[in-house]
Amino acid sequence: MRIKKYTKVRLLVNCCLLLFFLIDCGADRQSLYKDLLASLIYISDNKNIGSTNSDLTGSGSVSSSPADAAPENSILANSIPENMGIKILTHNVFLLPKTLPGWGNWGQNERAQRIVSSNYIQNQDVIVFDEAFDTDARKILLDGVRSEYPYQTDVIGRTKKGWDATLGLYRTDAFTNGGVVIVSKWPIEEKIQHVFKEKGCGADVFSNKGFAYVRIDKNGRKFHIIGTHVQAQDSGCANLGVVSRVNQFNEIRDFIDSKKIPKNEMVLIAGDLNVIKGSREYHQMLCILNVNNPKYVGVPFTWDTKTNEIAAFYYKKVEPAYLDYIFVSKSHFQPPIWQNLAYDPISAKTWTAKGYTSDEFSDHYPVYGFIYADSSTPTKSGRKRKYDRVSFVSVATGKKIQANSEKSNAWLKVNATTETDLTKFNLVQTNDPDSNPSCMKSGHVRIESSHSLNYFWNWWLGGGKGNYAYYPKFNDGSNRIQIINLDGGCLQDGSRVAFKDYDTISRRQYFLTVWEGGNWDKYLYLWRSHIGLREIFYLKLDSSPEMNWSKKLIYR
């Protein structure tokens, strides 16, 4: 009798959703939702209509099947021929113009080279790159992937040459192009660039943002892809640019409608859509674009200030967000399932720009879109490094070194009794280009707070009794600190280590010690000329497993 029990609730939900669609979508969009509302009447008991952003991640509850219960263009699971499936990747690669004031050189050329040689871009049918603004870096990227993806568009908004058509409001006086490029393994039969008539607000007004449209032929099957990067959530915009994004989404939808694409051909929209997953704006976006809610798997965010060093550099206090998507148009060919997988790879080799060393490809993580997972689909996080999130336990006191929970650059103290994010630190030997070495030995090391990325161990010399005490300093670690493995060989779990640094005043090296007594008891100091118990620490490697979503993927 459960059906009777929930009948009134479902009726109320459907009425509310109907009102929401009528308000949000406008009269010209209302007809698009008849099938959706009909399907909601028969929604199963375990459907989670009200999932939040975090609930949606990897759950598959509302996204394990297309939004329509029986879409007109759907087909049965496991009945898709290979040429009817497609694997598409979108990645905002953060290749800003090197001349951009306030941003400058973020290793654009080096990162483009790392992307070219990476594994994460392999085995796709189509890739949409966003923020490929910089001319030199973009050339490195496109030339480098050409052997696998020989069919390519130019970046949108740079020139009208080479396109079958240029639509929208193309501006010759724009400071920079639109940053979007599409590359394909399969022949591109048609390519159109559309520069948004809604040119946006804030910093976006200086670029020719819009979208690239391509029609590709994969073994006789036509696919239509729109790659885009819409208005950023800019503090210089009213309501963080919501109105501009709505107008730009409408331009995308109107373009799709104008193309009169056959209903049995698949239409995809991919890129950095700058809308937070699970928000009210997110559902409005799905409505305007007339796309299905995908099944989400992978990491919970595509722009993560807690795990990505570049994202954290400028926006440490901003919460992580899921902003990048690959959607399927509901008015066209419907696969039995559509999955979006957010992945967090790191470069196998580090890069250095203006003294800053990192292994990040970008400030965003890539997203894969596909019908069924296969052997090449990532099944776990790419961020499990041996010498990340290590902790140090004092041999003398049994307490752990920890950062401060309230202030990223407050003093380091050796007083933690339990393991937390504050007791975790990332080790990098910047002279070793291997981003994930299996064997780190004694030598110079950069020690970063796992809790506050880009804050590195340094010692204070600004007066007072705090002189020579250690604290995490933003983007400025001691470049002479060394880790000494007292047991010799590779650093392992349980290795006894000491730290040695150089005093620029006395021009002598000293060992770091746990201060004993007085107001500075348990603080970490550069002080001792010899090693005793208070200078020795046990190294503890992180034993927690990497995030694994293999059981949430759907395979053929």
Swiss-Prot record:
UniProt keyword annotation of Acyltransferase present: no
InterPro entries: Endo/exonu/phosph_ase_sf (IPR036691), Endo/exonuclease/phosphatase (IPR005135), Sph/SMPD2-like (IPR038772), Sphingomyelinase/PLipase_C (IPR017766)
Catalyses which reaction(s): a sphingomyelin + H2O = phosphocholine + an N-acylsphing-4-enine + H(+)
Gene3D superfamilies: Endonuclease/exonuclease/phosphatase
GO cellular component: extracellular region
Keyword Hydrolase applies: yes
Signal peptide: 1-27
Subcellular localization(s) per the UniProt record: Secreted
Pfam families reported in the protein's UniProt record: Exo_endo_phos
EC number annotated for this UniProt entry: 3.1.4.12
GO molecular function annotations of the record: sphingomyelin phosphodiesterase activity
Keyword terms, alphabetized: Hydrolase, Secreted, Signal
Main location per the UniProt record: secreted
NCBIfam families in UniProt: sphingomy (TIGR03395)
Protein name as catalogued: Sphingomyelinase C
Species of provenance: Leptospira interrogans
